Curated annotation (Swiss-Prot):
GO cellular component, one term: large ribosomal subunit
Key words, A-Z: Ribonucleoprotein, Ribosomal protein, RNA-binding, rRNA-binding
The protein's role, per its UniProt record: One of the primary rRNA binding proteins. Required for association of the 30S and 50S subunits to form the 70S ribosome, for tRNA binding and peptide bond formation. It has been suggested to have peptidyltransferase activity; this is somewhat controversial. Makes several contacts with the 16S rRNA in the 70S ribosome.
Entry annotated with the keyword Chloroplast: no
Gene: rplB
InterPro entries per UniProt: NA-bd_OB-fold, Rib_uL2_dom2, Ribosomal_uL2, Ribosomal_uL2_bac/org-type, Ribosomal_uL2_C, Ribosomal_uL2_CS, Ribosomal_uL2_dom3, Ribosomal_uL2_RNA-bd_dom
Organism: Rhodopseudomonas palustris (strain BisB5)
Quaternary data: Part of the 50S ribosomal subunit. Forms a bridge to the 30S subunit in the 70S ribosome.
GO terms under biological process: cytoplasmic translation
Protein name (Swiss-Prot/TrEMBL): Large ribosomal subunit protein uL2
Homology family: Belongs to the universal ribosomal protein uL2 family.
Coiled coil: none
């Protein structure tokens, strides 16, 4: 879908660039595939802020998206493509031959009326699901499982994808958008194709109020706060902080490595950080 620019009738309109969603379904979502969503404004169950700069925004309904695709060898037809306020990608409503409906992530080049299917050996076309071990090398995939049967976790945002670049016994080698190459078990499934809405990265919000509609509050730097609020706070006049950048809780930021998941390090063949050094 193309980008949509607006005439500069106001300062906010002048900068505004959005994705043209005119081809999407304009009605309400399927009620049986939705849930209520409570806005917590970044607070946890004790009322304390656990995520800063969140709050407000338009009320949203959560769409239950099927990331597992466990209905095997049952063809489904794409009924319509829809907007989903909970994610950057578009979603597709599919209807199986037995009448069951489900939402899936819409891949690029998937149209209304297309047929999709999940199985061990299916056609390599957008929207179909099969185990990574059965796919030909070079296939573009998204919604990749990391644990067998858990459902897709990798490459789910708008425009993202990964590429199957090799095999290693029971595992396959997958190259991610970040440049990282990692091993994934061959029995883990993935959906063929790249995720829809690749133009999402090119949108321009246009004004602060549009961020508020999305539930994002103003973000304040540490150096403009008081010492009680941030390690960089305080000082007479404008100061640079006087120490290496840290989080509000004193942990080093801006480049310090924080990954400590040693149990899965063996699955990462090429780190995304190594790619940047070349």
């Amino acid at each position: 879908m193309a980008l949509k620019k607006y005439n500069p009738t106001t300062p906010g309109q002048r900068q505004l660039v959005l994705v043209d969603r005119s081809a999407l379904y304009k009605g309400k979502p399927v009620k049986s595939l939705t849930e209520g969503k409570i806005s917590n404004g970044g607070r946890n169950n004790t009322g304390r802020i656990t995520v800063r700069f969140r709050g407000g925004g338009h009320k949203q309904t959560y769409r239950i998206v099927d990331f597992k695709r466990t209905k095997v060898d049952v063809p489904a037809k794409v009924e319509r493509l829809e907007y989903d306020p909970n994610r950057t990608a578009f979603i597709a409503l599919i209807k199986y031959e037995d009448g069951e409906q489900a939402y899936i992530l819409a891949p690029q080049r998937l149209s209304v009326g297309d047929s999709v299917i999940a199985g061990s050996y299916v056609d390599v076309k957008p929207g179909n699901v099969m185990p990574l071990g059965n796919m030909p090398v070079g296939t573009i995939v998204h919604n990749i499982e990391l644990k067998i049967g858990k459902g897709g976790q990798i490459a789910r945002s708008a425009g993202t994808y990964a590429q199957l670049v090799g095999r290693d016994h029971d595992y396959v080698i997958v190259r991610l958008n970040s440049g990282e190459q990692r091993l994934v078990h061959g029995r883990c499934t993935a959906t063929i194709g790249a995720v829809s809405n690749p133009d999402h990265m090119n949108i321009s919000i246009g004004k602060a109020g549009r961020k508020r509609w999305l539930g994002r509050r103003p973000h304040n730097r540490g150096v403009v706060m008081n010492p009680i609020d941030h390690p960089h706070g305080g000082g007479e006049g404008r100061t640079s902080g006087g120490r290496h950048p840290v989080t509000p809780w004193g942990k080093p930021t801006k480049g310090k490595k924080t990954r400590s998941n040693k149990s899965t390090d063996k699955f990462i063949l090429i780190s995304r950080h190594k790619r940047k050094k070349k």
